Regions:
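Acidic, glycine/proline-rich low-complexity segments that act as flexible tails and inter-domain linkers
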Residues: 2-126, 138-140, 144, 296-301, ...
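Residue-level signal for inorganic ion chemistry
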Residues: 76, 164, 220, 332, ...
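A generic, well-ordered mixed alpha/beta core segment in the N-terminal half of proteins
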Residues: 109-182
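Phosphate/diphosphate-binding glycine-rich loops and adjacent basic-rich segments that engage nucleotide
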Residues: 174-236
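Short glycine/threonine-rich catalytic loop with a Thr-x-Gly-x-Asp
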Residues: 294-307, 321-329
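Short, small-residue alpha-helix embedded
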Residues: 328-339
Length: 376
């Protein structure tokens, strides 16, 4: 198998950096090499330096493969959080995730998927819409890739796996081959970190002990396991985070990107206020400000209470009823438009409305449940 450029970056240091450390000691251990990276990010205000893309890739490689010590890893994560990762550092981290993490490929002729990047530590304040949005898009033939894990620090919020399970669709416990086969046949893939990326899962305890989101949390918003052409939709909270995301993903070669100031940093669009997002094509961001009021979708965002209530409301929404139907119509309609399934925004909202009224989204859920019952 021919190695990809990302694999080369993740596995090799830049020539200059390699020469500088090897000349000092030809047999440096992983811990000794990691000291050089830690020394850069962990210095004082005047002397702290950003890592190069290659250095950042190697630093995360050493972390994921446990060649750095626990003390070094903890120090690096908190120092990097305080200083904030630079775009090229995030790109280097992406290189390593691409090299060491799971890989998902579309079938020949399959439509490009929409890959949603949301905080892995879940939601605690607002009712998630994205599982239902995914079902509406799937019912129109639009493939979807989601990623997440079990409950984790710092929020310990509700996860994608739990939400789908409450609807009767179990998406954990699958091998990557099974996930890819299901994706190619049904259009949906959930990359579940405990099953598919154990190296990254091993770092969860550091989040708990640090008590803050490390830079890995920013990385999770930018990474997708999908290889090939796709539309990447990434959530953000603060404008500086969005700017770093644009630059990092441009360096990483992402061609089609949407950044969303969504609910709790997710890709869910609020209906209580204007939706701020950017559509980045060929490296040029176009700011979009979308008003739910213009499409008859303005209302209060639905609060999160518990999984039982959410499941009931979610099934109602798939049948075009209940409090989640309005935010679902808004979210699904917007993403139908942005993914190219609709000619304009109004047409997208109309398509979403038609899917809900016809029961197409609920039928898609039923088909996925049948598929899962026949796997494994």
């Amino acid at each position: 198998m021919i190695a990809t450029p990302a694999q080369h970056v993740a596995e090799e240091l830049s020539v200059e950096f390699r020469q500088s450390i090897v000349s000092a000691c030809p047999e440096l251990s992983g811990r000794e090499r990691f000291k050089a990276h830690l020394g850069k990010v962990g210095s004082g205000v005047e002397t702290s330096q950003g890592l190069s893309r290659e250095e950042s890739a190697e630093a995360l490689n050493l972390i994921l493969t446990a060649q750095a010590s626990p003390a070094q890893i903890g120090a690096f994560l908190i120092a990097h959080r305080i200083r904030r990762p630079e775009p090229q550092e995030l790109t280097g981290m992406l290189d390593t995730y691409r090299a060491l993490g799971p890989q998902l490929k579309s079938a020949i002729g399959q439509k490009r998927p929409v890959c949603f990047g949301m905080p892995f530590d879940g939601r605690t304040r607002t009712a998630p819409i994205y599982p239902l949005t995914a079902l509406v898009l799937l019912s129109t033939g639009q493939p979807i890739v989601l990623q997440g894990g079990r409950r984790m620090p710092v929020k310990y919020g509700i996860t994608a796996e739990e939400l789908f399970k409450s609807l009767g669709l179990e998406l954990k416990g699958l091998t990557m081959d099974q996930v890819e086969a299901g994706f190619n046949n049904n259009g949906l893939a959930l990359i579940y970190q405990p099953d598919h990326f154990p190296l990254a899962e091993s770092l969860i305890s550091y989040r708990d002990e640090i008590g803050k989101r490390p830079p890995l949390a920013s990385l999770e918003l930018l990474w997708t396991a999908h290889q090939g052409e796709h539309l990447l939709v990434s959530g953000f909270v603060h404008p500086p985070t969005e700017n770093r995301a644009w630059k990092a993903l441009e360096l990483a070669g992402e061609k089609s990107l949407i950044t969303v100031k969504g609910l709790e940093g997710s890709t869910d669009l609020p209906i209580s206020r204007a939706c701020v997002m950017s559509w980045v094509q060929a490296g040029q961001p176009e700011r979009l400000v979308l008003h739910p009021r213009d499409h008859g979708c303005f209302d209060q965002d639905i609060e999160w209470n518990n999984i039982e209530q959410w499941s009931k409301q979610a099934l109602e929404a798939l049948n075009n009823r209940g409090p989640l139907s309005q935010p679902l119509r808004w979210n699904a309609g917007t993403y139908l438009w942005l993914s190219g399934q609709a000619d304009n925004h109004a047409d997208g909202v109309d398509q979403a409305d038609a899917c809900l009224k016809s029961g197409a989204a609920k039928a898609t859920l039923d088909q996925l449940i049948i598929w899962r019952s026949n796997v494994g």
